Amino acid sequence: MADGGPTPQQSANRPDAPRAPAGVGLIALLSAMVMVGQASTSLYVPSLPSLGAALGADPTRVKLTMTAYLLAFALGQLVYGPISDRYGRRPTVLGGIAFYTLATLACAVAPSIDALIAARAFQGFGAAAGVSISRAVVRDRFERADAARVLSYVGMALSVSPALGPIVGGQLQVWGGWRAAFAAQVTLGAAIAAWTFVALAESLRAPDPAATRPSRLLRNYRTLATSRPFVVSVVLNGAIFAGLFGYVTAVPFVFIEIFAVRPDVFSTIFLFTVAGYFIGTAVASRLQRWGGERLIGTGTLVALGGGALMLLPPLLGLTHPAVIVLAMMVFLIGFGLVVPNAIASAMAPFPTMAGTASALFGFAQTALASLGSVAVAATYDGTVRPMAATVFGAGLVTVIAHWGFARPQAARA
């Protein structure tokens, strides 16, 4: 995608602080802030089948605990972004993580599936602060190429969470049942809140007192919604995340119920799957000289290939767990190439409203991504096909978005 340059007003208002190289400490802290949200899905995934049995809920109701979380996660970003433009990144993210920790405690003691669905929604709202503010902090401190590199490093670090989360979650399930997974998240939330309080410096140089006024919000959102690079980036990330969320929602049922894999063994399988994400983000961080456009284009084709590899065997009546793992590894290599570069492309033109841009980007991306979870929950029929079709469809949309809309614009630029 071609990045539009800042407007004269944006250039005039741009903070003149130097964009210093990111240290390991900052990358680790940003990763931890985002990890709050990831852990809330990966830690409890192995417990989904037993959770339903314990609370007397069918698989469709159980999957709503994921959907409610994702939708609230999307809406929460719309709140935190403008607030952070007005009051600063630090107080906003601290408040959000504290809210997350309390909501997670409510999840751990939920007496029914309805109470758990509601608590998961509040948990998602709190977790939204970490991911929304982390993008704004990166935009505050770094220009386009450096931002993509930092986001790639964060992605490499975050690949540990979906890899180890299900393994830890599987052991927690064996040891203490589904409530143990949420108890672990309470501890994680409190620890990250303390770390953020100690280590995160304010990165917003010029707070905007009008950032939360309705007229300013509408004007800013209109500016973002009419920016073609921004919109295409949202569609790219939303589609590729839809494939991931569809997979995460369905895969415990596919492996544990269809293939009769034990929860602790299933969680180990995630190590191989998430290796693709690590590879993709590692390549993206090392090959920024290729340019974001080329990396995104390559990533969309790789993701489509992974989706095709997952869908074709079940259509032919040939289903094997190893093929599913290999296909998702390929898909996640493409994911790792697309995501950091698409985020950087979306945020680059808007230095003076980074919080609001991050908010709308995250909301739209997560709302689109939740469609993957909804699609799988609505169509699950006890086979691999709904999950595979969702992953393939996600890859196809990314190819259309980039090669059909972003690529022609870049050629004209």
What are these regions (language model features)?
Residues Q77-Y87, G280-E293:
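Helix-to-loop junctions at the C-terminal end of transmembrane segments
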Residues A119-V160:
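Cytoplasmic helix-loop-helix junction between adjacent transmembrane helices
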